[in-house]
């Protein structure tokens, strides 16, 4: 969506080291004081008679930042939308009494959980409530979330034969294929409440606090974007090979080196699967998306560059083909990883519009590393950096 944006000039990224740490957010490519507005006279040029502005309404802060522009406020959201800090979330899960993956495939439940942080805190985006294991389930893979453990696979995939059997499956072909429609319905329900450039959000039946949160979130744009997400190919592959969470991902890294052909088939399948999962959310109305790589930090830069990055690029390419009915365009994409300070340049080169970082790297250092990785591309928006201990 086009908008009015006054020009600014970029200053040295070295000033970023004085930037304060913010919460989970996307910031423009030059954070804090490193973007300065041109003279106010230019504002008059963008105004019509009697001071009325010309052109369409402004974009939400998240979309402004992802486009590399400096928004009026730093967009903030819950990185993990299933926020156990929210009493209404805990109460809802207790009442529903269903396993995590089943909750993700219940449109009413998924939509309600997605909306809770926006209503309570007025955050700038609603991360769609789901799990990175959902696309595996929707391809007929036996997987469950065990309390205190995490994702557990019924049958790990560790041989060429097992990989061959797995990659014959397709997104939406499994016994839970109707779950694809459930995801689409849940996203549409969220968009109805959060609004879009075409229609304001529905507020009937909500508490005063919830309406206030939604109004703050919508801001001057008048609507709040839904953020789609999916697990990166390496993270999905690591779970598939290990069978459960692992500290060192030894089995996955062994397959990567001992059987590169099977690794290629596995990663290609994971990339297309998670890309289509994200695309499904976008086609239903999500306006932006994030590829989430929980385990890439366990890899060396060389291993990541040669055996992982091409597949992350493929997943992003698949996701980028989807057009959001909310904005009428492809969703901007964030590539986030944990413990990936040494990989930031490679993550950017995979093709995302912004790169996410965890608390183990300063924002200024991340911005400089990303700029050095591709000087011709210019500065890159950066997201994240809040220490979970806070």
Regions found by a protein language model. Give the residues of each.
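N-terminal basic, low-complexity leaders that serve as flexible interaction/assembly modules and, when applicable
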Residues: 6, 26-138, 143, 196-199, ...
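Alpha/beta enzyme core
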Residues: 246-289, 301, 309, 313-321, ...
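Structural preference for beta-strand elements that scaffold enzyme active sites
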Residues: 71, 77, 125-127, 225-227, ...
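Catalytic-face loop-and-helix region of soluble metabolic enzyme cores
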Residues: 321-390
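Active-site-proximal, glycine-rich beta->alpha crossover segments in alpha/beta enzymes
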Residues: 144-277
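Active-site beta-loop-alpha junctions enriched in small/polar residues
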Residues: 79-81, 131, 229-233, 294-296, ...
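Alpha-helix-loop-beta-strand connector modules within alpha/beta enzyme cores
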Residues: 181-197, 221, 302-329, 368-370, ...
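Active-site-proximal loop/short-helix segments
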Residues: 132-143, 223, 227-253, 280-307
């Amino acid at each position: 969506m086009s908008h009015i944006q006054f020009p600014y000039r970029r200053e040295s990224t070295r000033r970023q080291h004085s930037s304060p740490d913010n919460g989970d957010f996307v910031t423009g490519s030059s954070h804090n004081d490193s973007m300065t507005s041109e003279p106010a006279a230019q504002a008059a040029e963008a105004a019509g008679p009697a001071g009325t502005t010309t052109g369409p309404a402004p974009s939400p802060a998240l979309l402004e930042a992802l486009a590399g522009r400096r928004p009026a406020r730093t967009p903030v959201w819950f990185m993990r939308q299933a926020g156990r800090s929210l009493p209404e979330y805990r109460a809802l899960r207790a009442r529903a009494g269903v396993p995590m993956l089943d909750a993700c495939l219940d449109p009413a439940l998924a939509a309600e959980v997605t909306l809770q942080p926006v209503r309570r805190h007025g955050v700038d985006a609603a991360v769609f409530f789901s799990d990175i294991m959902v696309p595996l389930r929707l391809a007929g893979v036996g997987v469950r979330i065990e309390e205190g453990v995490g994702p557990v696979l019924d049958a790990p995939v560790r041989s060429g034969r097992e990989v061959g059997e797995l990659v014959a499956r397709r997104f939406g072909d499994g016994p839970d294929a109707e779950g694809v429609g459930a995801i689409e319905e849940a996203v549409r329900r969220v968009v109805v409440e959060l609004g879009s450039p075409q229609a304001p959000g529905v507020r009937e039946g909500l508490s005063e606090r919830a309406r206030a949160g939604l109004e703050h979130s919508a801001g001057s744009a008048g609507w709040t974007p839904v953020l789609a997400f999916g697990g990166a190919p390496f993270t999905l592959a690591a779970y598939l090979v290990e069978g459960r969470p692992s500290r060192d991902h030894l089995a996955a890294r062994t397959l990567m080196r001992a059987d590169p052909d099977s690794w290629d088939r596995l990663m290609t399948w994971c990339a297309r699967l998670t890309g289509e999962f994200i695309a499904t959310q976008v086609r239903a109305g999500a306006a932006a998306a994030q590829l989430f790589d929980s385990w890439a930090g366990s890899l060396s830069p060389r291993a990541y560059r040669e055996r992982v990055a091409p597949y992350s690029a493929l997943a992003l390419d698949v996701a980028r083909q989807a057009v959001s009915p909310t904005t009428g365009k492809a969703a901007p994409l964030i590539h986030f990883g944990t413990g990936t300070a040494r990989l930031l340049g490679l993550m950017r080169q995979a093709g995302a519009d912004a790169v996410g970082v965890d608390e183990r790297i300063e924002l200024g250092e991340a911005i400089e590393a990303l700029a050095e990785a591709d000087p011709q591309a210019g500065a890159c928006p950066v997201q994240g950096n809040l220490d979970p201990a806070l």
